[in-house]
């Protein structure tokens, strides 16, 4: 990193700035890089067919020998989902809490990377030392156990990364360690990187304990079957649902691979506790009274292939909605998922279920702190410089305002873009330069093989349709021997558009005869002539621009 001086610490992100997801941050001092998280981002609607988005790891691959380790703040997908794709390109040790490592272990096994990866479980009191830098941890509260903030000690000063956090004073699990945070602040912090997700919420975030009370209220009041959907990674929420089921004499059936895996890991690590006979097999749910059954499932985000979506649209093999069923959405829609969640809720209502959802029911709370919690973090850590992370630009902007309210000068606050490098030393900080960054699209097993041109083609196909032009040409005599024939898919209904098709065929035929008179032998030129002739004609007649695919056969 030539633009950073030898006595400066560099801080940068490959993902997570100006967006929700693909959180990947790094602290570099000279030849030592400490990597923090490697997450995925869920695609927005215009990314047709894309499964996930990860950062461009080019800089990390080129500097693999400098990476001392990857440190995980917690086990959510937007923080660990990219790790298998990163580890295909670099061989580095991974450090994290026992739950995060447990979730990651399953993920690496699926990708065939478990044997080659060195996994290290850390606790709050551990310190990982390298030649020039060291990494320590402090316990935070989030919507998943084993969440940590990270302190990277470098010669110019300490860099603190909060991870995702809230201050819950009646938590289900262990409370955040405010004492240690205050000690870190007292020792001195050069720069704070802090979670900006809920910076537009002026209040404290509701306690997870209050959600638990609402869950118990639902279980006491509902007589029929309860179908409960939430994030599989929200272990505390799963424990509270299971407790409510047990206390009300219900058995629990689990649907969804990620949910089954999370419960298995939670039980193994002691985060989920229940009597041995609590869980039942899938084939038992229809043999038991409705008021004795709870179904715990995935699909709270309206994912098309998740259990709840298939229940809602009637395609699930083992569960169909019965009169008296109550479906609980214990989540809020991730940006981009609002339409699919609404669709699922409507389908459930149409099928005859009662649906409990939304903020009025206190059945979900965020794992991210609001403004008062963000200000508390700022006052505990007391950084010299501040860099808001993990949020869209407006969230980062609001977080800077909170920082200035807490006494940090505005010129000491930096709203960064992915790839920009913040160079820090003593009383000085500046954006020193930029490294390669961007997005890599994952589609099935393909990684990075989907570019903007492919996405553009998918958009055209989805919105405008496809017209295939098939023509046979005798290249000896330069004459059309058959065709042109037109095939439409998603553009017009052929039987009802005979005049349009006939006119288009005649247009292409007349133009190709002129092309043949020039004795053209280049396939690409002939195809371009067909496209350039047909496209304006179709737009004039239909005001649509379908994708045109010429197929030329030589006779």
From Swiss-Prot:
Q: Per the annotation, how and in what number is the cofactor bound?
A: Binds 1 Ca(2+) cation per subunit. Seen in 1 crystal structure, it is not clear if it is physiologically important. Binds 2 Zn(2+) ions per subunit. It is not clear if Zn(2+) or Mg(2+) is physiologically important.
Describe the disruption phenotype.
Essential. In depletion experiments there is decreased 5'-exonuclease processing of 16S rRNA, decreased accumulation of correctly-sized scRNA, decreased decay of trp mRNA leader, while correct processing of the 5' end of 23S rRNA no longer occurs in the absence of mrnC. While depletion/deletion of RNase J1 or J2 has no large impact on global gene expression, a double mutant alters the expression of hundreds of genes. In a more severe depletion experiment alteration of about 30% of transcripts was seen. Later shown not to be essential in 4 strains, with a tripled doubling time.
Induction (UniProt): Part of the rpoY-rnjA operon, transcribed constitutively.
Keyword Magnesium found: no
Binding-site residues for substrate, renumbered to this chain: 364-368
Q: Which residues bind Zn(2+) 2?
A: 78-79, 164, 390
Q: What Pfam families is this protein classified in? A: Lactamase_B, RMMBL, RNase_J_b_CASP, RNase_J_C
Give any GO molecular function from the UniProt entry. RNA binding
What's the stated role of this polypeptide?
An RNase that has endonuclease and 5'-3' exonuclease activity, playing a role in both rRNA and mRNA stability and degradation. Endonuclease activity can cleave within 4 nucleotides of the 5'-end of a triphosphorylated RNA. Endonuclease digestion by the RNase J1/J2 complex occurs at a different site and in some cases more efficiently than J1 or J2 alone. The exonuclease activity of the J1/J2 complex is highly processive on substrates longer than 5 nucleotides, on shorter substrates is distributive. Preferentially cleaves ssRNA, possibly in AU-rich regions.
Q: What is known of its domains?
A: The C-terminal domain (residues 450-555) are required for nuclease activity and dimerization.
Additional remarks: Present in about 2500 monomers per cell in mid-log phase.
Specify the protein name. Answer: Ribonuclease J1
Source organism per entry reads Bacillus subtilis (strain 168)
